[in-house]
């Protein structure tokens, strides 16, 4: 599928008219299908990289939410300074971290989700993170760990291409991608 076709399909889905042609009540959940796992299965014997937990974070600081929101801005020019593994661990925990498990199909996380479903899977294109090789990774929130997925050539260019040609996506220390396991 070329970029123009993909853009048009995405645009259609985001328009209000999509409800006229898509029956949103025919979901897997409404049709009685079992829920997906809390985390996509990890291949047996796969190597994992443990991340430092909250008790080890010293470089994250004590900025109040109000102050953080007041300072927030978009930046498209990135420092060449690599992230520390601690900084990456904090960002992953803040965006999808598990605080507890309710039952085998629900978790309590640092972010809200209707019915504790949390369908998101977090993938990373790592360019400059201390202690990690440049490459693709998947975050394992139940373990607070990374699953290495490979080290493709031209990662910066392919990341920008995946972001519909936005070159800045391949220039930061790390780029987050989210996919969903809908139910």
Q: PLM ranges: what are they?
A:
Residues 1-175, 181-183:
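N-terminal accessory segments that position/regulate proteins before the catalytic core
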């Amino acid at each position: 599928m070329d970029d123009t076709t993909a853009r048009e399909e995405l645009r259609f889905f985001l328009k209000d008219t999509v409800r006229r042609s898509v029956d949103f009540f025919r979901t897997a959940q409404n049709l009685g299908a079992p829920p997906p796992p809390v985390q996509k299965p990890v291949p047996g014997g796969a190597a994992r990289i443990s991340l430092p937990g909250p008790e080890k974070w010293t470089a994250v600081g004590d900025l109040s939410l109000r102050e953080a929101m007041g300072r927030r801005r978009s930046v498209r020019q990135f420092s060449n300074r690599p992230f520390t593994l601690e900084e990456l661990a904090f960002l992953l925990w803040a965006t999808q971290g598990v605080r507890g498990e309710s039952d085998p199909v629900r978790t309590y996380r640092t972010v809200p989700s209707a019915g504790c479903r949390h369908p998101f899977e977090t993938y990373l294109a790592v360019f400059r993170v201390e202690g990690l090789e440049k490459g693709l990774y998947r975050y394992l929130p139940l373990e607070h760990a990374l699953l290495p997925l490979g080290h493709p050539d031209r990662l910066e260019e392919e990341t920008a291409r995946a972001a519909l040609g936005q070159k800045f996506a391949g220039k930061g220390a790390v780029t987050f991608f989210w996919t969903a396991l809908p139910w």
